[in-house]
Amino acid sequence: MYYYIFDVRQCKNRRQIEAIKDRISSLGISGEFVIPDKIRPARDLAEQGIFKGYSTIVAIGADGLIDEIAAVMLAKQQAFGVIPLNASENVHKIIAAGSWEDAVENLRYRRITESRVGIINEQNVFFSYCQIDFDKPTSITVEFEDYLLQAKARELYVANRFPGLPKKDPSKLDIIMKSVDPKSDTLWGKLKSFVSGTHIVQDLDISLVRSDGLRIFSPRQLPILLDGRVFAKTPATFGVSQKTIRLITKRSSKSK
């Protein structure tokens, strides 16, 4: 049975709320609907749904709700479904659904993909990617297991899934950086790789490194953004979950 955690604030109006419920009902995948609030946050509701014995926990909402529930779903036998509302384009791509209607269809056919998530500071998870918020080019240090990389950066992304970038290794994060001087003789320059087909490829070289863990330091604290909201601040550690989520995606999707 299905357990829907529905952030109704993401709906345009009451009519859309009813349209989503009606579509779910018409496909024969009705279940219990609950609405998160300050007293009962999404994380608690997800744990409650698992305790009640529901086989599928579904997040209906934006990136923040999805990430919060994803943290609960790690290593659980229940399937995790997503119906994105005001969510990032990347979330739509991960589940291979162009609209909430498509996402509901995904639930009907229940193609399960074992998926990992990114982890910040060993406690918070991110489903897609996060971004260091630079108000100006800033010197940063990125520490990997065997080496350090230092550069003056203007953009830096740490991604579990990044728009337009094929996921080469599900057990690693993709670290993508725009440096101020792309021709500088630094390790970033030596390791640089062009990421074709993404929205960030413009006039600068892109440095790309894949790793299962890293730490980012900066002379001053920098916000770490997830879908436009401050999620954490530097210094911060990043990793990829060893456990997986049983994510429902489109039947023809090849994402892993």
Question: What residues fall within each predicted segment?
Answer:
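ATP/NTP phosphate-donor binding region
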Residues: 1-57, 67, 75, 240, ...
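Catalytic core of DAGKc-family lipid kinases
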Residues: 5, 74-181, 185-189, 194, ...
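Residue-level recognition of short, well-ordered coil/turn positions
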Residues: 29, 54, 111-112, 229
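A structural detector for beta-sheet-dominated domains
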Residues: 37, 121, 143-145, 159, ...
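Short beta-strand scaffold positions
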Residues: 59-60, 82
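Polar, low-complexity loop segments and adjacent catalytic/binding residues used for recognizing
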Residues: 63
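Phosphate- and divalent-cation-binding pockets in alpha/beta enzyme and binding domains
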Residues: 68-69, 90
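ATP/nucleoside-binding phosphotransfer catalytic cores, i.e., glycine-rich phosphate-binding loops
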Residues: 186-256
